[in-house]
Amino acid sequence: MSREYSDTEQRNLDASRRLFAPPPGFDPATLFANDAVWWNGLPRLHAPGAGCEHRGIAAIRRLMGSANADTQHLGIDAYDLGTTRYEDLVELVDGDWVMRQHTMHAKTKAGRDYTNVYCFVMRFDAAGRIVHLTEHWNSWWADRFLFDQLAPTPAHPL
């Protein structure tokens, strides 16, 4: 069942779509308010003790930029955002809220196939910026698949 969206709802839906398919040269961090919060449920993506919240635009920029960092030496086989594609897209819009669920497919930096289901719930302010984003995903699978990818090494006697 479809319905017509209000101008505000359409603006918010368009912004959520730009977050996942930004046009060339567009900085997706500009979609967020300066005091926005991004919660993603996997504390290993943060500084130790930081929990699951990325609070403020600087923290959100660090999170978004971390996908391009070389982390293989740390045993993290991150997915390459340049290889992502989405299927099974579901979008729900209600006033200041947008919910987007999709199945994401990508290659990791080591060339492995990665697939996971994500659900993003976003709340927008009156200016059309994201003030809160909650990222639900199969974090157990991501943790097992993307992290701890260093080969075991034996102890070396003196």
Task: Walk through the language-model features, giving the residues of each.
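C-terminal and inter-domain tail/linker signature
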Residues: 1-158
